[in-house]
Swiss-Prot record:
Source organism of this protein record: Arabidopsis thaliana (Mouse-ear cress)
Name of the protein this chain belongs to: Probable L-type lectin-domain containing receptor kinase II.1
Bilayer-spanning residue ranges: 302-322
Binding residues annotated for ATP, in chain numbering: 361-369, 383
Catalytic activity reported: L-seryl-[protein] + ATP = O-phospho-L-seryl-[protein] + ADP + H(+); L-threonyl-[protein] + ATP = O-phospho-L-threonyl-[protein] + ADP + H(+)
Topology within the bilayer: Single-pass type I membrane protein
Taxonomy of the source species: Eukaryota, Viridiplantae, Streptophyta, Embryophyta, Tracheophyta
Alphabetized GO MF terms: ATP binding; carbohydrate binding; protein serine kinase activity; protein serine/threonine kinase activity
Annotated region described as Legume-lectin like, given as residue ranges: 28-274
Signal peptide: 1-24
Matching PANTHER family: PTHR27007
């Protein structure tokens, strides 16, 4: 009898112990293998009917949440209380072979009710437009993202990210695990239908968060086999972060998943959590089995679902077209008329590595320009207009309208654009050699431009201006021609860029006078006096540009000797003495004398005070190609519009002026000799 009683007691103890392993819970730690009796609060699509925690199913645009019912207490006076450790096994089954739904996340939240906070699709059922990126949200999540989207800016559709109060991850990486034998990370498809282990460990004292992944052995072992045996030594993500600034005193832990137009079944097969220490290792042999793959539906049900879907899409299309027509004027009409490719913000964010400073190519009056690389490998330059730029939108519209359809080998091509939440971004061809200004005036280049390279650049810019003035369907006035706006490609060909001040108009229509904009030294007399902008004002600026390239000097240089401060005036004085070539850049030892004289005289012709006496861009190109001889100005007189700039203006010049603090003097120059 005693033996029987002892046996009963023994098996009773074992039963209690096993029950504890299957469903062990206290306020600060618990382990679940079968979720049917787990102390969880479920909403949305989430259910535990078959043992595993089933977060999402084959429902479109839905969410599923599951939170441990007992709150976790985090005490501000004890940093160790913020330490926690959790591990869980998940499996995601896509309903279509190549599409994977939107993913899931482990969440620590001040509330168990995320139904009003979290939207579906790319927000993973956690965030929405109202609470995204708000410090008052107090949400921490580790996301397992299985679908590339334009909201979260993470990796490319199979990544793990750390989210703090926003769907935009503070750190993310392609899903993978460290293989010690191979000494490298091995890619790990998240939506493969296979079981995957995740460890999330946070040290509240050191303030370090580690996220580690590993595949689970299949089929399950018959005897106990613990997760600690397969945990990689190197975490996938490791980040210093102070969660005491994020967590409130009471938080809930759980999971969130979502679907959009793409559906998937998401399961949690086992879960262990502990506050203030290491979570109990999961026994792989005790994990819940994921259900079999979804069954094929009878033809009748398939047809019914298809008809319903078509009806829904048709109705949605009608509503979309109705709203599109109703709000057409709100959608910016110019965007339809001038429509280069539109990029998602996520793609540009990835391409520029989050607009990091080490990707910065330069900054101007309206914004910063960053280098980027698209997924295709194409290098781009992304101009991001400042939020507080008063003319930001106006400049953006001008560049889109002007550049979107312009095509010329000597123009920097606008590849596309992006508008998101007030952000203005323009995407251009990347010019690996930077601006011409860098080569002419900065010593950080490996070598100077040769004479033939400079001549080729001048001809290229002239060809681009001829296209803008005469060959495109409208007249395009660039209004800011200068060396810093000429970019150089890999072969050092010059390309005209930065259309931020550009204006375009139909042929035969004269533009009204406008506010004076441009750069000192490049602005024609009639522009500064009356605000008149024509192709002749572009020609005047091109003349200043020619002299700038040939002489290696800026049109106005406050650091030059007094007689050389105004470049066109100095060239004129040298012309009087039959010494034009004395003005050629001293770094050029291989220049061709006659070619240099032609360019200098052409620059002077473009600088005449009377716009009617300046040549057109077509004539200029004919002079440059040698098809027509330059007028014999060396034997006549030329009235030049030379800036009469005060010393104060010279020393306080700005790159782009809204007003011109100088006048022009009519100087008659007599050229003699060669």
């Amino acid at each position: 009898m005693a033996g029987v009683l002892g046996s009963v007691v023994f098996w009773l103890i074992i039963g209690i112990h096993v029950t504890f392993l299957v469903f062990a819970q206290e306020g600060d730690h618990f382990v679940y293998y079968d979720f049917r009796n787990a102390d969880l609060e479920l909403d949305g699509m989430a259910n535990t009917n078959h043992g595993p925690l089933h977060l999402t199913n084959n429902t479109n645009t839905g969410t599923g949440h599951a939170f441990y019912n007992i709150p976790i207490k985090f005490t501000a006076s004890s940093l160790s209380s913020f330490s926690f450790s959790t591990e869980f096994v998940f499996a995601i089954f896509p309903l279509q072979k190549s599409t994977y739904g939107h993913g899931m996340a482990f969440v620590v939240s001040p509330t168990k009710d995320l139904r009003s906070n979290g939207s579906a699709n790319s927000n993973l059922g956690i965030f929405n437009r109202a609470n995204d990126n708000k410090t008052a949200t107090h949400i921490f999540a580790v996301e397992l993202d299985t679908n590339q989207n334009s909201e979260s800016f993470d990796k490319g559709g199979n990544d793990v990210g750390i989210d703090i109060n926003s769907i935009v991850s503070v750190e993310s990486a392609d899903a993978s695990y460290f293989n010690a034998r191979k000494g490298k990370n091995i890619s790990l498809p998240l939506a493969s239908g296979k079981s995957i282990l995740v460890w999330i460990d946070y040290d509240g004292i050191e303030k370090v968060l580690n996220v580690t992944l590993a595949p689970v052995q299949t089929p399950k072992p018959d005897s106990p086999y613990f997760s600690s045996f397969i945990k990689p030594k190197v975490p996938l993500l490791s980040r210093s972060i102070n969660l005491s600034e994020i967590f409130t005193e009471t938080m809930y832990v759980g999971f969130s998943g979502s679907t959009g137009s793409i559906k998937s079944n998401q399961y949690i097969l086992g879960w262990s959590f502990k506050q203030g220490g290491k979570a109990e290792s999961l026994d792989i042999s005790r994990l819940s089995n994921p259900p079999p793959s979804p069954k094929r539906f009878p033809l009748k049900e398939v047809l019914g679902a298809t008809i319903s879907t078509i009806a829904f899409l048709t109705l949605g299309g009608i509503v979309y077209l109705y709203k599109k027509k109703k709000y057409a004027e709100v959608l910016e009409q110019w965007e339809k008329e001038y429509s280069p490719q539109r990029y998602s913000f996520r793609i540009l964010y990835k391409a520029t590595k989050g607009f990091r400073e080490n990707q910065l190519l330069g900054a101007g009056g309206f914004g910063k320009v960053y280098k980027g690389i698209l997924p295709s490998g194409t290098q781009i330059a992304v101009k991001r207009v400042y939020h507080d730029a008063e003319q930001g939108m106006k400049q953006y519209v001008a560049e889109i309208a002007s550049m979107g359809r312009l095509r010329h080998k000597n123009l920097v091509h606008l590849l596309g654009y992006c508008r998101r939440k007030g952000e203005l971004l323009l995407v251009y061809d990347y010019m690996p050699n930077g601006s011409l200004d860098d080569y002419l005036f900065h010593k950080n280049k490996l070598k100077d431009l040769t004479w033939s390279q400079r001549v080729n650049i001048i001809k290229g810019v002239a060809s681009a201006l001829l296209y803008l003035h005469e060959e495109w369907e409208q007249v395009v006035l660039h209004r800011d021609i200068k060396a810093s706006n000429i970019l150089l490609d890999a072969d050092l060909n010059g390309k005209l860029g930065d259309f931020g001040l550009a204006r375009f108009h139909d042929r035969g229509v004269n533009l009204e006078a406008t506010r004076v904009v441009g750069t000192i030294g490049y602005m024609a007399p009639e522009l500064t006096a009356m605000g008149v902008t024509t192709t002749c004002t572009d020609v005047y600026a091109f003349g200043a540009f020619i002299l700038e390239v040939v002489c290696g000097r800026r049109p106005v240089d406050p650091d030059a000797p007094r007689e050389q401060v105004i470049l066109v005036k100095w060239v004129a004085s040298c012309g009087k003495r039959d010494a034009l070539t004395d003005t050629v850049d001293s770094k050029l030892i291989d220049f061709k004398v006659e070619e240099a004289k032609l360019l200098l005289k052409l620059g002077m012709l473009c600088s005449q005070i009377n716009p009617e006496n300046r040549p057109s861009m077509r004539q200029i190109l004919q002079y440059l190609e040698g098809n027509v001889s330059v007028p014999a100005i060396s034997f006549g007189t030329v009235a030049l519009g030379i800036p009469n700039i005060s010393h104060e203006t010279v020393t306080q010049m700005t790159t782009t002026s809204s007003s011109a603090n100088f006048s022009f003097e009519d100087v008659t120059v007599l050229f003699g000799g060669r």
